[in-house]
Amino acid sequence: GIGMTADTSKETVRIEKDITGYIITEKGRYRFQSDSFLYLLKDNTYVLAGRVVMKGEEMNLLCDKLVIFSSNNEVDKVDATGKVRLISKGTIAKSEKAVYHFKDDRIVLTEGPKILKNNVEMEGESIMYNISNGKFFINKPKTRIEK
C-alpha cells in the first residue's frame, strides 16, 4: 500500500491507497485488495474499504467494506457490507451484508440476499454458503427464472 500513518494515541495504523496482501488461516490463504486499510490495535480488527476484493481457493468476495475480527492470531469472522458479491463455481450471491464465520466455515448473506445460477434467480430471508462443500442454502426462498 501507499501512505502509511500510525496514530499512537488512537492505537491505529492506516494505509491510504492501493492495498494488497493476504491472510493465512487454517482454512486456507486469502488474498485481498482494497482502496484503504485501517488496523485497530485495541480491538485487533482490520477494516478494508473502497473497492474490496477477497479471494480464496473456492470463492471470491467483493464489497464496499470488509471488517476482519481476530483473536489470538486467528481470524474469528469477517463482516462484509455494501454491494456484497460472493462468487463460487459459477454461482453469484448478492446482498448488502455478509458475515463469514471462520470456525463454522460458512458465510451468511442478509439484507436483500439473492442468488443467481444458470439464469435462475432466487431470493430469501438469508442465504448461507457452506465453504467446505460449496453448497448454498436459501432460507425462505422465492424463485424467478430469467429467459
Per-range role (PLM):
Residues G1-K147:
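Mature-chain termini and adjacent capping regions
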